[in-house]
Amino acid sequence: YTNFNKRLNLQDIPHIPVLYNEILDCFKEIKTGYIIDCTTGYAGHSSGLLNQNSSVQLICNDQDDEALEFSKKRLKDFEKRVEFNKGNFEDIIKKFEDYPIRGILADIGVSSLQLDKLDRGFSFNSKNLDMRMNQNQILDASTVVNSYSQVELENIFKEYGEIREYKKVASLIVQN
């Protein structure tokens, strides 16, 4: 933890990135070219990577507008070495295939800030059921659970949620 504090100014970040030192160690041998941060979030890892090597360039990708706006401010001192891309990471490699990519970082999952912000609809304490990583997407979780058929919900829970009792869960949702 002490080493972590020395390498990262905690006051600058609303979220502490996981495995920070380990991630920096993985990328320390990259001296030129681009690193893609597929899930930039609040730029904890990105900031560390840019500080660690003054010649590496970064492509910062995220689908969350709020996270990207924060990251742009946070990485302002590195603006000549950073490109921002709004979108899901699924097409990022194709979009930047002509760049000299030397490394890829993907911190997959929901950020604790998304969970903590009640208006995002990820928390059990939220008043609305939203759960959109990209707030510009039209389809939210409330629409899914309130308008999809029992068969459609069963398929979602079985295929994506890997829920054993998927039929029971879908039935309870449709009944209520």
Give, region by region, the residue ranges found by the protein language model:
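S-adenosyl-L-methionine-dependent methyltransferase catalytic core, i.e., the SAM/SAH-binding region
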Residues: 1-176
